């Protein structure tokens, strides 16, 4: 299929059968129209209304019930890595050395309970990420690139589950190396507060993941606010 020549709008794009495709005679679908939206609730509503035939996302609060009763709901593997990116030029790192900023980012990362996010938010059997390279990538020699992850030197994504207190204490140690102080209760001192903003679009899954991270960081007194915006604003903010 190829573009039908019309301008792609903010909410849809249309493709038509390409007569120059080498096997065009076997193409039976003459036109494809795609709904463009970052709002999974709107996408799911359009599917239920019969406005679209296929969707690849649903609101997270619908997943559990769909698994049990809807034969049209399928979970399939896909290569990908969900990640949170830092703006290293933000005020958060303004007075820090590169080494101190790295300590801060590591502390934030190890405090995130990835297993909780998978079980309670994503709910589709994802694996916790411990590098940018996703699971399932070939190694070029007929094998899988990532196997015994921790033994290969990768970050242990289950550390926060297997040794919560030890992992939290490591996060405190990293933040102390970056100049932050803690009280006797293990919480950040009011002398050296940490506040940061988490930017996401309005999809329910992204917001809920942000809320889970917000709760994890609050465990030692880090204040993270969640800023929701539509997709176009989100892209501009990230530039």
Locate predicted features.
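Ligand/substrate-recognition segments at binding pockets and active sites
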Residues: 7-11, 161-168, 178-239
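Ligand-site clamp/hinge motif
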Residues: 15-65, 214, 223-225, 230
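A bilobed periplasmic-binding-protein/Venus flytrap-type ligand-binding module shared by bacterial periplasmic
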Residues: 16-22, 79-104, 111, 120
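Sec-exported extracytoplasmic/periplasmic mature domains
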Residues: 20, 48, 52, 67-68, ...
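Second-shell loop/turn segments in exported
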Residues: 33, 51, 91-98, 104-107, ...
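Short, hydrophobic alpha-helical packing/hinge segments within bilobed ligand-binding/sensory domains
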Residues: 43-44, 104-105, 234-238
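Ligand-binding "clamshell"
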Residues: 63-77
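Structural transition elements
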Residues: 127-178, 201-207
